[in-house]
């Protein structure tokens, strides 16, 4: 059009999704003396009369000509919902009450396996030869499962509903267990379907309308009708102790079988999540519509933790794998003791069993009992031999004895399951004051996930948001903000400041419930401020930080909580000490150093800590800088409930309640620090349509694929045969042919030599045994579950505790060179400090109010805000419980040290010492060995020290050729014991170590720093 009109100047403006796209027209030989401009909007063409320049408000996104006024509400809305980048930075955290429906039917299949070592192509692989299981829970489901077990010829034990199977054939145990679980799954889902069909006769009309042969063939898409009847909720738990890291892996190739004969009417949801060599989730749900489902409008029940049948969109049968180890974090014997369960004495010589299956025999003593070498000690050998003689069962049958102990473990685990369920339900009802919640501890797989759910429930009850999320009280950082917040999470300190043998007395002080105390302190809450309000709040921070002479109060009401990008410079080295207030990863390793900090991400608490320790802190401009509108003690009630329950349990001698309160108190911090990634592992047949579309669009890619080793499946081996284009069959030889002389065979150029091998047909589909690792092509992580910034502030509060501790020890040394100061501490762990006699004296004097035995608070009081933490002397006398010290100690490296003994300061009793050797077999080490190791290294001796231990390599999904998915292999791990070589501190005199500083910088730090040279200014 413009070409036809030929104006002096012409252009077309197209309005698309809030943007104007200009297309300039090139006009040759113009006729009209004036310009013409068109606007295309919503498929309509407008003639532009005139242009007027406008401006866009960077805070609210509005356009204006001359002047403009925007409100805080509009700025917040634009920042959190409109701006294409910041609108994805913070997500609301979804909420569901911790309770479950009262009508839920639960069935538990508790099992354990025993294995022997099989030498295969992937190394020493552990193969199950025995499996025992016990049935408990809903009587109808127990009876059904018992009938299935008997039909499949599982052998019954003397205890009711207890069955076992023994076979050394590789793969047979797993196949039998798979068949059992599969048949239970099939029959229980049939129960749900029959009930659904009986209460919905309209399904017969759907069958006729869609010309379906049988009502069982109706698909989920067909029965989208308004259903009737009472929903059923059935949960089936496959449970064992420490099975997710072992038993479920060696059986998984058999039991993870997804292509089943499940009726097409069911909607199937699967949740399979391997993590850190363990199967964290292996759940599958078979769902049908819930006729009572209603979208909730009144959330009063949710505040009480109550979940009703109307809250579930589907009625279901759920199959879940749960591990009692993930809920107790200790061995089965210790867990039984903690929850006051009876445990039979004795143990099994598993190495003898292993030899029996491997070579057919094992060493025996003169009575036919397994030799002493199979037992941990002579005492264990004598005890078990005495128990065997008491039973008077004749000759020692190693398989029968193994079966007996396996059955006992299963029965103890089953009793533990019942105890955990009842105890946690009572704890939530009485201690958390949620009697209507009907809490089920096995609904979530780990103690961390349960603690997080309880925390959210308590917070939801307090804030009452009246919606299905926590509103803006607590948000989750996502996308770019997730990575930014994760940069502010700094691990705990762990390093010695003295290497060698220390002949001075050493006391060990430990912070009491460090994370629990930190969690009671205030944390940032509310929707982060928009850039305009953020700049105003940051100005107040800058003003306070510029005054280096004035310390800042941690609870200054003028300063809002936030996360900043900072530079910081330390004071003169004479005013530094061995406990730096902050750490950095700039050199590739986490170092607690007194070096200048550049471009570090830190919480507002860290800014105050650095400032109060004499550091000059500068806030750097960063669009990701986050400032929150208020402080709030979001976790105080949760921690206070657990501390109160623990103290009450101590008074009442209730070991069960004490164990629960202690576990829940310690587990919450870890849930906030959960690290997410962009990967997920699925079986090939689990790729739903939505996942396939994301792969097709390029949003996800298949990072790797691997197959479960086929040896684990049952198979039929066919004789040799040719599949395609076989060579022509040879004609029968006649007599004349037999007498002919054989001539030299010269092959043709095109000749191929065929070697025919047996073909094995597996009883499985390829999709069932193929694992895909899917990875999001975007590096940004979507998070709507965890308030990760809470973990940052928890760790920041713990650094405040240690910073105050440093003041007790080192304040009097300010102004002295570091190498001339008296040694006051020699080792620092995350929540403990090893101090000398001088350090102990200062703790008793300057830090007296922080020692637990002198009284003090563990829970922060918002009405009288002050830093709240306590310590106690961990080295105590075994007899009188007074403070004790180690007369001699040796420190080799982080988490590698030994205290020779503990000498009581009151009664003089000499007790046993303490040894820590992470990654080593501690049974092979003692104080003298570590001391010899140090002396040999210091004197450049030739003696070398090693420890060896058996290690289990767990493989779930891999693209490595030397490892098969779903296998556990046994390897011998040998490690060298030696003093610290790659130190992250400066060696002063061969013994003392000091943090890096300006005069002794970190040699690993190769970051480039741009600066202007003075002569170029």
Swiss-Prot record:
It is found in: Host nucleus. It holds the Pfam family DNA_pol_B_2. One of its GO terms (cellular component) is host cell nucleus. GO terms for biological process: DNA-templated DNA replication; viral DNA genome replication. It catalyses: DNA(n) + a 2'-deoxyribonucleoside 5'-triphosphate = DNA(n+1) + diphosphate. InterPro entries: DNA-dir_DNA_pol_B (IPR006172), DNA-dir_DNA_pol_B_adenovir (IPR014382), DNA-dir_DNA_pol_B_CS (IPR017964), DNA-dir_DNA_pol_B_mt/vir (IPR004868), DNA/RNA_pol_sf (IPR043502), DNA_pol_palm_dom_sf (IPR023211), RNaseH-like_sf (IPR012337). Keywords: DNA replication, DNA-binding, DNA-directed DNA polymerase, Host nucleus, Nucleotidyltransferase, Transferase, Viral DNA replication. Its EC number is 2.7.7.7. GO terms for molecular function: 3'-5' exonuclease activity; DNA binding; DNA-directed DNA polymerase activity; nucleotide binding. Gene3D superfamilies: Helix hairpin bin, Palm domain of DNA polymerase, TPR 1 domain of DNA polymerase. The keyword Ribosomal protein does not apply. Disulfide bonds: none annotated. This DNA polymerase requires a protein as a primer. HAMAP family: ADV_DPOL. Eukaryotic-type DNA polymerase involved in viral genomic replication. DNA synthesis is protein primed, and acts in a strand displacement replication. Assembles in complex with viral pTP, DBP, host NFIA and host POU2F1/OCT1 on viral origin of replication. The polymerase covalently transfers dCMP onto pTP, thereby initiating complementary strand synthesis. Belongs to the DNA polymerase type-B family. Heterodimer with the terminal protein; this heterodimer binds to bp 9 to 18 of the genome. Forms a complex with viral pTP, DBP and hosts NFIA and POU2F1/OCT1 for initiation of replication. This is DNA polymerase. It comes from Bovine adenovirus 2 (BAdV-2).
């Amino acid at each position: 059009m413009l070409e036809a009109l030929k104006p002096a100047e012409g252009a077309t403006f197209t309005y698309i999704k809030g943007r104007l796209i200009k297309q300039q027209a090139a006009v040759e030989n113009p006729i009209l003396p004036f310009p013409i401009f068109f606007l295309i909007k919503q498929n309509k063409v407008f003639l532009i009369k005139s242009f007027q320049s406008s401006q866009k408000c960077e805070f609210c996104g509005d356009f204006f000509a001359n002047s403009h006024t925007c409100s805080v509400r509009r700025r917040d809305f634009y920042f959190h919902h409109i701006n294409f980048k910041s609108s994805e930075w913070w997500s609301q955290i979804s909420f569901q009450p911790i309770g479950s429906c009262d009508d839920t039917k639960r069935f538990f299949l508790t099992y354990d396996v025993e294995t022997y070592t099989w030498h295969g192509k992937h190394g020493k692989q552990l193969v199950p030869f025995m499996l025992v299981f016990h049935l408990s829970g809903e009587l109808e489901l127990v009876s059904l499962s018992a009938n299935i077990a008997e039909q499949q010829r599982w052998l019954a034990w003397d205890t009711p509903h207890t069955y076992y199977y023994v076979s050394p054939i590789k793969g047979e145990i797993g196949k039998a267990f798979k068949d059992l679980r599969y048949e239970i799954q099939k029959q229980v889902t049939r129960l749900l379907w029959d009930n659904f069909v009986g209460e919905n006769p309209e399904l017969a009309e759907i069958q006729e309308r869609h010309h379906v042969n049988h009502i069982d063939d109706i698909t989920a898409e067909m029965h989208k009708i308004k259903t009737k009847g009472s929903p059923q909720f059935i949960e089936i738990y496959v449970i064992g102790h420490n099975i997710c890291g072992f038993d479920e892996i060696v059986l998984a190739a058999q039991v993870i079988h997804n292509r089943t004969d499940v009726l097409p009417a069911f909607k199937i949801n699967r949740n399979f999540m391997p993590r850190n060599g363990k199967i964290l989730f292996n759940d599958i749900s078979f769902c049908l519509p819930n006729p009572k489902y209603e979208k909730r409008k009144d959330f009063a029940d949710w505040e009480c933790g109550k979940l009703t049948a109307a809250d579930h969109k589907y009625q279901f049968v759920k199959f879940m794998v749960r591990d009692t180890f993930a809920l107790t974090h200790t061995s089965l014997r210790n867990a039984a003791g903690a929850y006051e369960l009876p445990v039979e004495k004795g143990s099994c010589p598993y190495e003898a069993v292993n030899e029996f299956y491997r070579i057919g025999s094992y060493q025996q003593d003169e009575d036919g009992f397994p030799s002493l070498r199979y037992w941990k000690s002579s005492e264990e050998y004598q005890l078990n031999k005495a128990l065997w003689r008491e039973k008077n069962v004749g000759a020692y049958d190693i398989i029968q004895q193994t079966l007996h102990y396996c059955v006992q473990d299963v029965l103890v685990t089953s009793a533990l399951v019942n105890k955990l369920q009842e105890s946690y339900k009572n704890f939530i009802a009485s201690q958390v004051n949620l009697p209507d919640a009907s809490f089920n501890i096995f609904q979530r797989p780990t103690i961390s996930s349960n603690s997080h759910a309880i925390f959210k429930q308590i917070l939801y009850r307090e804030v009452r948001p009246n919606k299905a999320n926590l509103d803006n009280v607590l948000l989750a950082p996502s996308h770019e903000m997730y990575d930014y917040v994760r940069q502010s999470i700094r691990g705990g300190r762990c390093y010695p400041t003295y290497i060698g043998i220390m002949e001075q007395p050493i006391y060990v002080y430990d912070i009491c419930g460090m994370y629990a105390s930190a969690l009671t302190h205030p944390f940032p809450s509310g929707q982060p401020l928009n850039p305009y309000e953020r700049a105003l709040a940051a100005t107040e921070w800058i003003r306070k930080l510029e005054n280096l002479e004035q310390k800042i109060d941690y609870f200054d009401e003028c300063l809002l909580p936030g996360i900043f990008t900072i530079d910081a410079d330390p004071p003169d080295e004479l005013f530094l000490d061995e406990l730096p207030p902050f750490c950095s990863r700039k050199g590739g390793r986490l170092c607690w150093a007194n070096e200048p900090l550049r471009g570090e991400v830190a919480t507002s608490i860290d800014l105050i800590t650095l400032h109060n320790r004499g550091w000059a802190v500068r806030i750097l401009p960063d669009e990701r800088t986050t400032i929150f509108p208020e402080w709030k003690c979001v976790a105080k009630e949760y921690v206070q409930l657990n501390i109160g329950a623990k103290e009450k349990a101590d008074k009442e001698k209730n070991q069960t309640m004490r164990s629960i309160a202690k576990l829940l108190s310690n587990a919450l911090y870890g849930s906030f620090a959960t690290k997410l990634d962009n990967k997920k592992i699925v079986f090939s047949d689990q790729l739903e349509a939505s996942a396939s579309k994301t792969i097709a669009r390029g949003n996800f890619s298949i990072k790797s694929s691997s197959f479960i080793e086929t040896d684990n499946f049952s198979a039929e081996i066919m004789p040799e045969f040719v599949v395609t284009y076989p060579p022509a069959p040879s004609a029968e030889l006649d007599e004349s042919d037999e007498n002919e002389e054989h001539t030299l065979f010269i092959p043709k150029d095109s000749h191929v030599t065929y070697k025919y091998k047996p073909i094995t047909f597996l009883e499985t589909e390829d999709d069932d045994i193929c694992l895909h690792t899917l990875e999001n092509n975007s590096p940004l992580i979507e998070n709507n579950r965890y308030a990760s910034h809470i973990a940052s502030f928890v760790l920041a509060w713990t650094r405040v505790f240690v910073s105050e501790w440093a003041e007790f020890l080192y304040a009097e040394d300010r102004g002295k060179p570091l190498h001339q100061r008296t040694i006051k501490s020699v080792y620092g762990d995350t929540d403990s400090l090893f101090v000398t006699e001088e350090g102990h004296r200062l703790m008793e004097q300057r830090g007296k109010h922080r020692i637990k035995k002198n009284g003090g608070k563990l829970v922060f009081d918002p009405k009288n805000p002050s830093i709240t933490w306590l310590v106690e002397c961990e080295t105590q006398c075994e007899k009188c419980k007074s403070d004790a010290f180690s007369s001699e100690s040796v420190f080799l490296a982080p988490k590698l040290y030994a205290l020779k003994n503990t000498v009581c300061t009151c009664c003089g009793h000499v007790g046993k010492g303490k040894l820590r050797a992470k990654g080593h077999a501690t049974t092979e080490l003692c104080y003298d060995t570590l001391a010899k190791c140090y002396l040999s290294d210091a004197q450049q001796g030739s003696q070398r020290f090693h420890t060896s231990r058996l290690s289990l390599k767990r493989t779930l999904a891999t693209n490595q050729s030397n490892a098969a998915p779903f296998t556990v292999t046994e390897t011998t791990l040998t490690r060298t014991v030696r003093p610290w070589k790659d130190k992250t501190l400066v060696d002063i005199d061969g013994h003392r170590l000091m943090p890096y500083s300006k005069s002794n910088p970190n040699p690993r730090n190769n970051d480039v720093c741009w600066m202007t040279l003075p002569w170029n200014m």
